[in-house]
Amino acid sequence: MPAPAATYERVVYKNPSEYHYMKVCLEFQDCGVGLNAAQFKQLLISAVKDLFGEVDAALPLDILTYEEKTLSAILRICSSGLVKLWSSLTLLGSYKGKKCAFRVIQVSPFLLALSGNSRELVLD
C-alpha cells in the first residue's frame, strides 16, 4: 500500500505589520542649517500636509531617534501611511527658503532591520 501523498499549503501574509520604520536623512544645499527634534517633526508633518491635506497630516508618526548633527532620524509610521509619507518627503524641496532633500536610507516593517547595514559590514 503506497504512503499517502504529502500535502503542502503555502501561506502568504501580506503586510501583517501595523507599523513601518524608516531611516531618513535631511540634506541641505547650504551647510550650517540646524533643526531640533521638534522642528524636524514639524517639517515632516508640513510636508505631508502640503501634499495630501490636513486629514492625512494627522497620520500617527513618531520620531524614535534623531541626531541633530547629521539631521538623520528613525521614524515609525502606520503601514497605511507609509507611501504618503515617503512621497511627501521625496517631493519636499525647501525649508524656510533653503533648498533641501530627504534621503530615505532604509525602510522595513521590522525595527531590528534598521540596526545594521549589510553593505557596511566589516568582517574580522
Curated annotation (Swiss-Prot):
Database matches in SUPFAM superfamilies: Rnp2-like
- Role according to the record: Component of ribonuclease P, a ribonucleoprotein complex that generates mature tRNA molecules by cleaving their 5'-ends.
Matching entries from InterPro entries are given as:
Pop5/Rpp14/Rnp2-like, Rnp2-like_sf
Q: What else is known?
A: This protein is produced by a bicistronic gene which also produces the HTD2 protein from an overlapping reading frame.
What quaternary arrangement does the UniProt entry report? RNase P consists of a catalytic RNA moiety and about 10 protein subunits; POP1, POP4, POP5, POP7, RPP14, RPP21, RPP25, RPP30, RPP38 and RPP40. Within the RNase P complex, POP1, POP7 and RPP25 form the 'finger' subcomplex, POP5, RPP14, RPP40 and homodimeric RPP30 form the 'palm' subcomplex, and RPP21, POP4 and RPP38 form the 'wrist' subcomplex. All subunits of the RNase P complex interact with the catalytic RNA.
Q: What is this protein called?
A: Ribonuclease P protein subunit p14
Cysteines joined through disulfide linkages: none
Q: Which GO terms describe its cellular component?
A: multimeric ribonuclease P complex; nucleolus; nucleoplasm
Tell me which domain of life the UniProt entry assigns to the organism this sequence originates from: Eukaryota
**Coiled-coil regions, chain positions:** none
Pfam families named among the record's database cross-references: RNase_P_Rpp14
Q: Which GO terms describe its biological process?
A: tRNA 5'-leader removal
Keyword Signal applies = no
Primary residence: nucleus
Keyword field contains Nucleus: yes
Molecular-function GO term, any one: ribonuclease P activity
Record-stated family: Belongs to the eukaryotic/archaeal RNase P protein component 2 family.
Give the Gene3D superfamilies listed for this entry.
Ribonuclease P, Pop5 subunit (3.30.70.3250)
What PANTHER family does the annotation carry? RIBONUCLEASE P PROTEIN SUBUNIT P14
Cite the entry's keywords alphabetically. Nucleus, RNA-binding, tRNA processing
Q: Where in the cell is it found?
A: Nucleus, Nucleolus
Residue stretches spanning the membrane: none
